[in-house]
A protein has these predicted regions:
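Beta->alpha loop/short-helix hinge microenvironment recognizer with preference
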Residues: 1-383
Length: 383
């Protein structure tokens, strides 16, 4: 028996979910896309074998960024394009988190306070790396928002892939070898200050909304108590790993860029009421265990992580900012004496891409091994 998928879970439990909850327009769109992905609802490419006449139908995917069936190719294409941005230099992985007491307010103001996470994280890196006490150079970094923990609970945090060196004001290359050059205590202090300053400014200018468990923070005294608690709490950014070299960086990036709240391979079992899936227990050094929750709760948790409309989740800063990226990276390569790594997939058609990535030849007939002609009929539809 095949393992259940996210699509299967939505088919079984989404009607019951709707009796209890009201999804946002973006959540409803994600559900509609997931339910119809690769079913024929979005059309199909129909190919005919030139030798035996056999017909093969390939159903189109939904391409929704929350769909677990639609992330593999976009991830590979994005990773391939980023090859040209990677230098032969150390890289570090930083994670910025906020106290979980802020979660209700953040969820009520997702776009606003997700943006605040990016602003605070990027401003922290820029301030500390430009300080001669730490590095005194302009670095490049990519920030990626994740909003989930292993159990699909709401846990907004920023993953940052940081170049371990940069250009000084005199356009000289400077790094600190493989040693991480920013004190964690300094990152924590500066990040907390910048995030809280922006949060308080949003409150003072009446830009925040409060729903659900965040309703109480409409009250000035309750909000002030929340702010005080945040200053008292530990803000724990951390550096996860040091790595070097193009392939290491690209592979590492791919683990985070197109990840969604849960992938199909983590789902173990589904019955008429519950869903069982694997989670990491970080209290036991990341050991895997099984968690069983109701199907309705599974959908509620999954939909918490549908991003706001047109929200940009992967953002580039510093040397990787598109306005000056080519010029600055070229200078860095010249100073480091390293070559530019070229894209392997650019300008290639999908059959070539699939063959190169997965050794799948979609131009070969499954019936006779003959050659499939180009799709003769396309049936584009939108649900």
């Amino acid at each position: 028996m095949n393992k259940p998928t996210v699509q299967d879970i939505f088919r079984r439990f989404y009607p019951a979910y709707l009796e209890k909850y009201s999804p946002s327009p973006e959540q409803a769109k994600a559900v509609r896309n997931i339910l119809n992905c690769k079913t024929g609802a979005y059309g199909a490419n129909i190919s005919v074998c030139e030798d035996c006449g056999a017909v093969q139908i390939h159903y189109n995917s939904c391409r929704n960024r929350c769909c677990p069936m639609c992330q593999a190719i976009p991830k590979e294409m994005w990773m391939d394009a980023r090859r040209e941005d990677v230098l032969d230099a150390p890289y570090f992985h930083l994670v910025f988190t906020v106290p979980d007491i802020l979660n209700p307010v953040i969820y009520s103001n997702q776009k606003l306070l997700y943006d605040t996470l990016y602003h605070a994280a990027s401003a922290t890196i820029q301030e500390l790396t430009s300080d001669p006490k730490h590095l005194g150079a302009s670095v490049g970094y990519i920030c990626i928002l994740h909003t989930w923990g292993s159990e699909m609970n709401f846990h907004p945090h920023i993953h940052t892939i940081l170049l371990g060196g940069g250009l000084t004001p005199k356009n000289e290359w400077k790094d600190n070898g493989t040693e991480f050059f920013l004190p964690i205590w300094a990152i924590s202090k500066v990040f907390r200050g910048k995030y809280m300053d922006e949060l308080k400014n949003l409150w003072n200018t009446d830009q925040l909304e409060f729903h659900g468990t965040a309703e109480k923070y409409r009250n000035h005294y309750e909000f002030k108590e929340l702010i005080d608690s945040c200053y008292d709490a530990e803000w724990v950014p951390y550096c996860k790993k040091t790595f070097n070299g193009t392939q290491s960086v690209i592979h590492y990036l791919g683990k985070y860029t197109h990840r969604i709240a849960i992938s199909n391979h983590r789902i173990i079992h589904m019955d008429d009421e519950n869903v069982t899936f694997s989670v990491k227990d970080y209290r036991k050094e990341g050991q895997w265990k099984e968690l069983t929750i109701s199907g309705i709760e599974f959908i509620r948790r999954f939909l918490m992580h549908v991003p706001p409309r047109r929200f940009v989740r992967i953002r580039h800063y510093g040397l990787l900012c598109s306005r000056s990226k080519h010029k600055k990276l070229t200078l860095c390569r010249n100073l480091l004496g390293c070559k530019k790594y070229l894209s392997k997939l650019r300008d290639k058609e999908m059959p070539e891409i699939l063959k190169q990535l997965y050794r799948i030849n979609i131009c070969v007939c499954k019936s006779c091994g003959g050659h499939l002609g180009k799709p003769q009929l396309r049936i584009p539809q939108r649900c």
